[in-house]
Amino acid sequence: AALRAGSPRRLILAPGNYGLDYLHEKMPALKNIPVVKTSNFIGDTMDMAAASHFEEVVLVGHIGKLVKLAGGIMNTHSRTADCRTELLCAHAALCGASRDVCAALMNAATTDACMEILDEAEMREPVLSSLLDAIQLHLDRRAAGAFRVGAVLFSNQYGPLGQTRTAKELLDEWKNG
């Protein structure tokens, strides 16, 4: 269905098994869209999607991987660049977080722990909104006009966390035909 003549060429990218599992469990309406498991190579996979003339791409992944996109990091392996807590802290600071909240974020061991800290500070929504805007910016830069792209973030502990502006648009279009 995603590759039929006359329809936009659509693709879902999932950085790992968590993303694949989330797609099957929480987004069954998208089962006819081709899915590529990217591993840590999100930027390279986006480049291949452009070379293959896909027109619409949605990344679906765990916040622990996709938060790195907010910093323009397109190879998400922890040996290449980690900075999950640093990016969460930076966006929390932009949203008015206290020094104590920022310190707690910097010392958190996981992104789920960061979500707990943000919940306690009643800052999860604005911080995720800021992160999603930054992710959208970096995805658009990497796609360089070759295709529309967005991202869906989730946590195994907290479930759906949000989606970028373009992901929302694309998913609405995909569900409606």
Kindly give the residue locations of the regions a language model identified.
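N-terminal loops that bind phosphate or other acidic moieties
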Residues: A1-E55, K65-L66, A70-G177
